[in-house]
From Swiss-Prot:
Job description of the protein: Necessary for efficient RNA polymerase transcription elongation past template-encoded arresting sites. The arresting sites in DNA have the property of trapping a certain fraction of elongating RNA polymerases that pass through, resulting in locked ternary complexes. Cleavage of the nascent transcript by cleavage factors such as GreA or GreB allows the resumption of elongation from the new 3'terminus. GreA releases sequences of 2 to 3 nucleotides.
One MF term in the entry's GO annotations: DNA binding
HAMAP family, A to Z: GreA_GreB (MF_00105)
Record's keyword terms, sorted: Coiled coil, DNA-binding, Transcription, Transcription regulation
Presence of the UniProt keyword Coiled coil in the record: yes
Coiled coil stretches, renumbered: 45-66
Highest taxon of the lineage: Bacteria
Descriptive protein name: Transcription elongation factor GreA
GO annotation (BP), single: regulation of DNA-templated transcription elongation
The family this protein is said to belong to: Belongs to the GreA/GreB family.
Biological source species: Jannaschia sp. (strain CCS1)
Pfam families, sorted: GreA_GreB, GreA_GreB_N
Length: 156
């Protein structure tokens, strides 16, 4: 299997979520299923079916997290420098609107655009890889091409 690049923070967050699921949520849902079973006929027991559905989701998420953690290749951005690569925090200026944006390039498993965590496989990240401060990049989006100037690169 292919390794999944991940920052130390991303791995820590995944381990935290896994611990929460295994030590708190899984036991709680097992208890809820047992209580719902006590209510009798399972064929029309909405509480039971709801709890089983939630259990299925929790077990699926646990498997997903365990898989990602086992394939994690932790890359500490603090040890990197130079042109943009995985782990870089990049300050950009939208050439059209002059709006400033800051993104950290991370792996798929920890990407969250709302938090400024940009998936390394995204079109913008792919355009930024290998570039340096002062360079401009153009990214094709569903709304048309967008240009960005790279103002600052840091590895924190």
């Amino acid at each position: 299997m292919e390794k999944i690049p991940m920052t130390p923070k991303g791995l820590e967050a995944m381990n935290g979520e896994l611990k929460q699921l295994k030590s708190v949520e899984r036991p709680a849902i097992i208890k809820a299923i047992a209580e719902a079973r006590e209510h009798g006929d399972l064929s029309e027991n909405a509480e039971y079916h709801s709890a089983k559905e939630k259990q299925s989701f929790i077990e699926g998420r646990i498997k997903e997290l365990e898989g990602s953690i086992s394939l994690a290749q932790v890359i500490d951005p603090a040890t990197l420098s130079g042109a943009i690569k995985f782990g870089a925090t990049v300050d950009l200026v939208d050439e059209e609107t002059e709006e400033e944006k800051t993104y950290m390039i991370v792996g798929e498993a920890e990407a969250d655009i709302e938090k400024g965590l940009l998936n390394i496989k995204s079109p913008l990240a792919r355009a930024l890889i290998g570039k340096e401060e002062g360079d401009s990049v153009e990214v094709r989006t569903p709304g048309g091409a967008k240009g960005f100037e790279i103002v600052k690169i840091s590895y924190v």
